[in-house]
Structure formats: C-alpha cells, structure tokens
Amino acid sequence: MAMIFCNTLYSSSSPSYLSPLTSKPSRFSKNLRPRAQFQSMEDHDDHLRRKFMEFPYVSPTRKQLMVDLMSTVENRLQSQLLPCNLPPDVRNFNNPNGSAEASLHIRSGDKSSPIDFVIGSWIHCKIPTGVSLNITSISGFLNSSTKAPNFVVELIQSSSKSLVLILDLPHRKDLVLNPDYLKEYYQDTALDSHRQSLLKLPEVNPYVSPSLFVRSAFSPTASMLKIDAEEEDKLEEILRDHVSPAAKEVLEVWLERCVKEEEEKIVVGEEERMELERRDKSFRRKSIEDDLDLQFPRMFGEEVSSRVVHAIKEAFGVL
C-alpha cells in the first residue's frame, strides 16, 4: 500500500514533458518518500482502528457502550499509550469458511506509565446449532510499578434476549493478607453497589463461571451476572439504563483511583515488585491456556489461531 501511494505521488508531481526535471532527482525525494510511507501507515492504522470500533455484530446500544468505554480509555490515557503495533492479520482476522471473525486492539503503556497495556476485542462466531456467539471486551492491565487493580468489562451473548456480563477491578494482592487493599479499592469506592443495584432487576441473576480459576481471579465485588429478558427491547433497555452507567462508573474508579500514580500505590520494594510480576504473568498465562489455546483453534483453525495467540502472548509478556 505504501509503495502504491508513493508511486502515485511522484508520478503526479513530475510531468514527463519537463525533461530537465525528470532527469534530475528532486531535492525533496528523500523527505517525501518516508513521509508518504508514514502517511500510508497512519491511514492503514486508522482503518484498522475504525474496523475494531465498528463492533459490527452487536446491537446499537451495546456498540455504543463499547465505543464509549474504549474512547474514554484512549482519550484519558492518550499520553501514556503507545500506538497499536499488531500485524494487520492479527488486528482483524477470520476463519477460512467465514463463519468466525474477530478484531483485536492492543496498546502498550509508555515506559514511564503504570499501564502495562490496554486490550479491546470483539469476536463473532456462528455455532453449528445455528446461533451466533458474540463477545466484546475491554481490559486494562497495570504493571509492577503499582499494586492497584486491573479493569475488565466483557459481554458474552449467544441469544438476542440474554447475555452474560463480567465487570470488575480484579485484585492483584491477597485480600485476606492485605485488608487495607480491600478497603481502599473496594469498600471506600462502594464498588459492590453496582452489582447490588443490577441484581435488584428481576431479569438479572448471578452468573457462576464453570471455571474455578476464573472465579478465583475476580474480586468479591465483581458483577458476574446473567441477564435474561423476555424481549430484545427489554434487554436493550437494561443495557442502556443500568449496565452502561455501572460500567462507566467502574471505569471511572479505575482511571481515578488505580491508574493515577499516588505515593501509597507505588510499589517500593523489589520483593513486592517481583511478586506482582509473578502473579500477573501467571494470571495471563493461565488465561491464555484455559481460553484462547482451547477455543481459538476451534473457531479460527490452527494456522490463524497460532498466529494470533502468539501475538497476544508477546503483548502479554508470556512468550
């Protein structure tokens, strides 16, 4: 794409009838070529980001929620995030028969930032039973310079009238051994109020993951909920009036109380830093093994799955 752009630029700016100009190299050529290549790369990157932000297989209400959350993360943390550098065939990919498609957007944090990386994704897969599985998720992972929790929101849907919601600030310290951590991030922020409010709706019930690992990884205040509505419009109403405000408030807590570097959150001791790194990598590695390593080959085939999972492992620092 860059070469086509450059060739077009030079052919249109050098008329053939001006022989002195065509026989003499332009003094701007060395500058124009990298600029053209850079512009082309920027255009391609923008196209792939727009593709991710389409969230094309979900309802307008759900799409708006995901766009709002991702835009808030990128706008508020813009100075701390590096551009997404995933290969194009990892940022958007599908399986050979076209029954599954996914988009991936990962931005690493700057070296001076407490952010390790932010990841957003959507997955669409037609299941042999005739239904479609649609998963949309956004997560923020912090590095070992801070002990503050991470952020996750995920919506899993295989029916137009029901879905599973996971919304949490997953803890990175043992809550029994560190009661001050529990108080600071979960009690003082009233994080459990969102789960309690959602559970007051007759359509909402607790969701119990079949994975013991998943259940152990989330905080006691996690909103792990199953929403069953009689009508599609009712599900949209719950998403718009209840889930969306809760997700935005939890994200705000993460941005204000976890990402901002304050003295009490900075990890000082080398032993504590190493322990956080071990825990973070163990969590990421186990998540990939139990989820992507098992499910992606079924959805996308071995070749595509291998390429994408390798890129994710590299971004997660667990290669």
UniProtKB/Swiss-Prot annotation:
Effect of G140V: In acd2-12E13; spontaneous spreading cell death lesions
Catalysed reaction, written as an equation: primary fluorescent chlorophyll catabolite + 2 oxidized [2Fe-2S]-[ferredoxin] = red chlorophyll catabolite + 2 reduced [2Fe-2S]-[ferredoxin] + 3 H(+)
Tissues in which the UniProt entry reports expression: Expressed in all tissues tested, including roots.
Pathway assigned in UniProt: Porphyrin-containing compound metabolism; chlorophyll degradation
Keywords per UniProt: Chlorophyll catabolism, Chloroplast, Coiled coil, Membrane, NADP, Oxidoreductase, Plastid, Thylakoid, Transit peptide
Binding sites annotated in the UniProt record for red chlorophyll catabolite: E154, Y207, V208, S209, D291
Subunit structure: Homodimer. Interacts with HCAR. Interacts with SGR1, NYC1, NOL, PPH, PAO and the LHCII complex. Part of a SGR1-CCE-LHCII complex, which acts in chlorophyll breakdown.
Additional record remark: The absence of light completely suppresses cell death in acd2 mutants.
Protein's UniProt name: Red chlorophyll catabolite reductase, chloroplastic
Gene this protein is translated from: RCCR
